[in-house]
Amino acid sequence: TIYNHLFWGPRPASYLILTFVSFFLLLLAMGINVRLSIVGALAFGLCAYNFQILQVGHNSKMVAIALMPMVLAGVVYAYRKKAFLGAVLFGFALSFEIAANHPQITFYLGMIILAYVIAQLVSAIKNKTLPAFIKTSCFVLLATILAAGTNVNRLWPNWEYSKYTMRGGSELQMAHAQGNQTQGGLNKEYATAWSYGIEETPNLLIPNFNGGASASELSKKSKTYEILKQGGVPNAEQVIKQMPTYWGPQAFTAGPMYMGAISVFLFVLGLVVLQGTTKWCIAGISLLA
């Protein structure tokens, strides 16, 4: 299938290549020149979080994240330049996104698209270009339906059987059942157990703000190793290879979601300097996240 041809070379390296290309297309669609688009693509693809999820085997999540910018590129190109060609790119990319089979990431992507479309609607009303907006939206809606249709063999069984899983609720629940299961599916605490805590937000800018990974290797020059040796702890060399350095709210983690100080600085600078409705769309969805 076309989807399988998206990955060039051995995996997971091919996932990163797809991430670079995808974000490069998004920046081009937004009118950024080629050189800056290359730099932006590298910054997005080399984000520390991408390597963490690859390390722990979240391949479908990585692919879904890699395809997000390509989907957005289609939407942006449709509303900014050529509606039909943008919708075609959007349709193909969204079909691939759904095929990646990570509904959580696709749901977040849908929130971003919705925010962007609302921003375009506000702009269309302000600039009195509502007919063009409606035309483009029809193309995008049709592409969405076709993209979902190409994955109906995956979506339909998931929807049908989700009612019998721990995430879809069950009629077999005991009257006084406790824990994570509720009659309507999983409770909020369980569903958000691996979500970033508010106090962890500085990790985006400051690496290891809430510590590192739940199992990190420390140096023999560290104070921890020195104390272990002084205390006569046996096999201290082995102990420091699996030290818990994370103190955030999650049960455990492979490391912080560090986005890069320069990237975060440029993001904030863009929110201050740039004009237009797209800026407020990005700011709003970032606060919601």
Language-model-derived ranges and their functions:
Residues 14-30, 35-123, 136-158:
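Membrane-embedded helix bundles of polyisoprenyl
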Residues 125-138, 221, 225-241, 266-289:
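Membrane-interface helix-loop-helix junctions at transmembrane boundaries of multi-pass membrane enzymes
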Residues 10-31, 36, 253-284:
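Selective detector of the "anchor" transmembrane alpha-helix that sits immediately C-terminal
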Residues 50-63, 243-258, 289:
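Membrane-helix boundary/interfacial segments in multi-pass membrane proteins
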Residues 131-159, 175-182, 283-289:
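Hydrophobic alpha-helical membrane-interfacial segments at the cytosolic entry of transmembrane helices
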Residues 1-12:
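Juxtamembrane segments of multi-pass membrane glycosylation machinery
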Residues 1-2, 43, 287-289:
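Conserved oxyanion/phosphate-binding beta-strand-loop segments in alpha/beta enzyme cores
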Residues 153-270:
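Periplasmic/ER-lumenal interhelical loops and adjacent helix-loop junctions
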